[in-house]
Amino acid sequence: MTNIIDQINAEQMQGKEIPDFNPGDTVLVQVKVIEGNRERLQAFEGVVIAKRNRGLNSAFTVRKISHNVGVERVFQTYSPIVDSITVKRRGDVRRAKLYYLRNLAGRAARIKEKLSGKKGD
């Protein structure tokens, strides 16, 4: 039974192209929004503060500041609502979950940019 479930999960994950990103990275997520009878793409750009790797049930949390209010949104990685994910900037952090950023504002909430040391990175 579990083999069948794993096989279905693998099929669902196969068609989606997900870039490699980590907490601390700034990403641009294109989300499909349906308004009435038309569909459009809405951009949500922010810092990844958490990532949950669970196969088909994988998710990540993106935080941005909009009009001086912190906005967090949790995206299911393989959801059909998520059209594309683009990594804008790599962040250099030492934590897997960056929940401490919720309590910081302005310059204190900045994340150092990761300098690529290797050619492939």
Swiss-Prot record:
Gene Ontology biological process terms from the UniProt entry: translation
Its job: This protein is located at the 30S-50S ribosomal subunit interface and may play a role in the structure and function of the aminoacyl-tRNA binding site.
The name this protein goes by in its record: Large ribosomal subunit protein bL19
A single GO molecular function term of this UniProt record: structural constituent of ribosome
Listed Pfam families: Ribosomal_L19
InterPro entries in alphabetical order: Ribosomal_bL19, Ribosomal_bL19_CS, Ribosomal_bL19_sf, Translation_prot_SH3-like_sf
Family (UniProt): Belongs to the bacterial ribosomal protein bL19 family.
Keyword Ribosomal protein: yes
Coiled coil: none
UniProt KW keywords: Ribonucleoprotein, Ribosomal protein
